[in-house]
Amino acid sequence: MGSAVTKIVFQPPEPTYSKDPNLIWLNTSEHEVIPAFFIDRDAKFTLLFSHGNAEDLGMIIQYFREVSHILEVNIFAYEYTGYGMSTGEAHEQAIYADIEAAFKYLRDIIGIPWQEVVLYGRSIGSGPSVHLAAKTAVRAMVLQSPLASIYRVALNTRFTLPGDMFPNVDRIGKVLCPTYIVHGTKDEILPPEHAEALVRNCREGVAYPPYIVENGGHNNLEIVARQPFYDNFSKFLQWLEKEEIPEDLKLQAQETSL
């Protein structure tokens, strides 16, 4: 069932971009090669973005040039294995290897310390984001229209079943960094119960007040509530800049490393 679900879950579009000299090429631990782009505004925080399903880097780069300007952040976005100009075929472990390769490049090559990295996962991108935040220290995490787990979407179950993919609802309890969740009340793909379950399973003090977008769907939160969407995002980043880094997060940084 696992391989069948994998084929259903991952829906890479036909590549919308070609090889470009401005792309960064990363080698992953799964022996694949994936592209990424970096928008550098010399800002305090860098968003490490994990995109949604059925899209690739070519579909989001113009949008993130705007986001970088609005939020005054750097943005590092990477491609998934099997998507766009990447090699290989998409599967859960490959996606985890992709975000780990992206984080290592940010930290070791570009020189962005973990204290300035904010994970930003949208839809299926919540999976690799929660995986990384549970595994190593980052400054914060933003989840937009996240999923509790794949089987909770596909089978409408409230329990974690053997072979489940991206079990965010079980894993998020290991996350120590501040976590901000945004979801729409009319999300037709991932109902808001997914976000509610994630908030409920966060450790005490980890969940920043979530933003629930009235009448927001799965792919239109920035359209339905453009100004409040960015205002709330900015407020979170401003709060983050003033907030002391939690001691348990500092300890995690000392004890774990990719």
Predicted stretch roles:
Residues 89-111, 170:
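Alpha/beta-hydrolase active-site loop
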Residues 185-190, 218-220:
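Acidic catalytic loop of the alpha/beta-hydrolase fold
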Residues 1-28, 33:
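An N-terminal hydrophobic leader/cap segment in hydrolases
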Residues 196-200, 204-258:
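C-terminal catalytic histidine-bearing segment of alpha/beta-hydrolase fold enzymes
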